[in-house]
Regions:
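A glycine- and Lys/Arg-enriched "phosphate-lid" helix/loop adjacent to the NTP-binding pocket
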Residues: 40, 55-57, 109-160
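Pre-Walker A (Motif I) flank of P-loop NTPase domains
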Residues: 3-8, 88-90
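Hydrophobic/aromatic beta-strand patches that form the interior of the parallel beta-sheet core
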Residues: 8, 34, 115-117
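P-loop (Walker A) phosphate-binding loop of NTP-binding proteins
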Residues: 13
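ATP-dependent small-molecule kinase phosphotransfer cores
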Residues: 32-109
Length: 162
């Protein structure tokens, strides 16, 4: 058996529903959902890495590719070691990573992509409203500032959009 994680990738703009769809898939036996945002939020905010990630996200900027992939890889390995994710019996559902070609290249030695799902949205104002609601309900600080949200859309268009 391959050491690569069998993976489904969820792509889409901020607020397109990647996390929602990932959570739904993750509840189905045989699937495990892992959001890159959850990896970042799992960092201790007072740690050097936590402060660094918060600094980028509070400005609506992407965390550098090599750091993002390394943090993801360490987090995924911990999930396997703790028995939360079983690569032999579960398909990994990823959202928020990889965001660009550089991250995809860095992740080639970890994942075997079986399916790619692109969630297309056309109304940016509805996505802003969705992100603002999420900020209130899920205490997501990265979704509280509309200027930051709009910078995230611009980053998505520049770095990720097909």
């Amino acid at each position: 058996m391959s050491d690569l994680f069998r993976t489904i990738l969820l792509f889409g703009a901020p607020g397109s529903g990647k996390g929602t769809q990932g959570k739904i898939l993750g509840q189905i036996p045989g699937f495990f959902h892992l959001s890159c945002g959850d990896v970042f939020r799992a960092l201790q905010p007072e740690s050097d890495l936590g402060r660094m990630v918060l600094e980028y996200s509070s400005r609506g900027q992407l965390v550098p590719d090599d750091l993002t992939v390394k943090l993801w890889q360490v987090h995924a390995s911990r999930l396997v070691d703790a028995g939360h994710f079983s690569p032999d019996g579960e398909i990994l559902v990823l959202d928020g990573i990889p965001r660009n070609v550089a991250q995809a290249e860095l992740m080639q030695s970890y994942i075997d992509v079986k399916q790619l799902v692109y969630l297309e949205t056309h109304d940016q104002e509805k996505m802003v409203a969705r992100l603002n609601r999420r900020a209130l309900h899920e205490n997501r600080l990265d979704d509280t500032n509309e200027a930051v949200i709009r910078r995230r859309f611009a980053e998505y268009e520049r770095e990720t959009a097909p």
